């Protein structure tokens, strides 16, 4: 007499539920993992109070070294276009202060973008954010080590944005940085941007400072 063997079957719904649980655990874990940046950065704010010294007007806002903390900070502060005239934002690598006298800056210079009054509404915030992304994303390949930081100056006559580099004689690095920066901002090819050394800028007014390099 034949005996019926007990059926062994797997419940497909159970295995699917376990897979979903595993996927949820992975997603939840990724939510807590921050993405580190190559460098630690410091954001500074300058407010031009003539009753105080220049150094007293410069204030460190915060430091960050992850993608998530960058966006948290950026979304928390005022846009550049909303700042009062005479104010600056500066983003520099940790350990470098946003002043010409700093050891990493004193033999350096800057790629300078000058904006018209009309460009404050149209381009300023977009240009500044793209500048920040170039810095924290190390957009300049092997020459990103030459980058010290960037500054946006809010001024009545016209705003300025600049990327500072550490050595005004390092032509290869400077030109590469300038070309990448110009492309990232979407500046038309016919528009020329210039690079000036801090030493020249310190001894001359901005309108007469000679460009060492142009792209």
UniProtKB/Swiss-Prot annotation:
Pfam families: IF4E. It is found in: Cytoplasm; Nucleus. Residues 1-23 are annotated as: Disordered. Its main location: cytoplasm. GO terms for molecular function: RNA 7-methylguanosine cap binding; translation initiation factor activity. Recognizes and binds the 7-methylguanosine (m7G)-containing mRNA cap during an early step in the initiation of protein synthesis and facilitates ribosome binding by inducing the unwinding of the mRNAs secondary structures. Also promotes export of a subset of mRNAs from the nucleus to the cytoplasm. This is Eukaryotic translation initiation factor 4E-1A.
């Amino acid at each position: 007499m034949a005996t019926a063997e007990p059926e062994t079957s797997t419940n497909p719904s159970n295995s699917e539920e376990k897979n979903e649980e595993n996927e949820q655990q992975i997603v939840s874990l990724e939510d807590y993992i921050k993405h580190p940046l190559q460098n630690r950065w410091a954001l500074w704010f300058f407010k031009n109070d003539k009753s105080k010294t220049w150094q007293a007007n410069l204030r460190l806002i915060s430091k960050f070294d992850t993608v998530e903390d960058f966006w948290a900070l950026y979304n928390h502060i005022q846009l550049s276009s909303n700042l009062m005239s005479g104010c600056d934002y500066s983003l520099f690598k940790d350990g470098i202060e946003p002043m010409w006298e700093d050891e990493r800056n004193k033999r350096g210079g800057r790629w300078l973008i000058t904006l018209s009054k009309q460009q404050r509404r149209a381009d300023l915030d977009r240009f500044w954010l793209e500048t920040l992304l170039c810095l924290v994303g190390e957009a300049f390949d092997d020459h990103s080590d030459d980058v010290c930081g960037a500054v946006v100056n809010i001024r009545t006559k016209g705003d300025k944005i600049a990327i500072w580099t550490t050595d005004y004689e390092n032509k290869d690095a400077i030109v590469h940085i300038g070309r990448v920066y110009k492309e990232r901002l979407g500046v038309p090819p016919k528009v020329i941007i210039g690079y000036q050394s801090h030493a020249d800028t310190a001894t001359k007014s901005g309108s007469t400072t000679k460009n060492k390099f142009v792209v």
